[in-house]
């Protein structure tokens, strides 16, 4: 918009912001909403940028819109099969109706306890979901193959406070432990060193393991360069998490870089 282009933003959601709008509802992350709010304020001052919320566009609508440049910012989705840093194959039993992903917690769909949060991502998400569930009154067990909760946050000097917070809330922590199998009302756990197994009763399981980019729409479009040329589309690009699951800061940088480099060769 600042470079003078006519820009149309079609957002499938009813509010702008993508994952920022979701994650800023988690305990302690309200300030993250400013990442969205500042940009919304800037866009509202630009006559050449139009925003359409609750506006899903299929391939046909994109093709017929008349834009010369198409940018997909469709994000990434948390896996529901348990594949992550430790498990390279689907965890047995991961397809059950009592097995959830992070979005289900943020949208209030996890109702039955005890809840096991399995964190094989090791960043901030698993611990925050456990904190939210605990403050909502659920009995929570935090299971992780790591030696500590949210191992990545050792680099940001937050790890001690995060683990202390969970313990203060009564969250049970099972470290250096993997999930071998998900049953209907219990888990079969395994020590990551010896493989020794144990059982853990549960009502729901939340898998926080890894994310996959929502890139399918881009690839469908990119397969038809002849059609794109016919309708006047010059370029199609991916930015943010749908290019590669990353931090919010990196996704913002990705979008800014695209905007700076558009038509740079002309």
Residue ranges and their predicted role:
Residues 1-50, 117-161, 169-172, 216, ...:
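Beta1-alpha1 glycine-rich phosphate/pyrophosphate-binding loop at the start
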Residues 16, 56-57, 105, 242:
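Hydrophobic pocket-lining residues within nucleotide cofactor-binding pockets
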Residues 19-20, 77, 212, 242:
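Gly/Ser/Thr-rich beta-alpha loop segments that engage phosphate groups in nucleotides
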Residues 20-22, 65, 81-86, 154, ...:
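Short acidic, glycine/serine/threonine-rich loops at helix termini
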Residues 21-22, 79, 244, 259:
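Short, electropositive, low-hydrophobicity segments enriched in small/polar residues
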Residues 33-80, 94-97, 102-104, 110-112, ...:
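A Rossmann-like FAD-binding core segment of flavoenzymes
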Residues 86-123, 186, 200-265:
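FAD-site-proximal beta/loop scaffold in flavoenzymes
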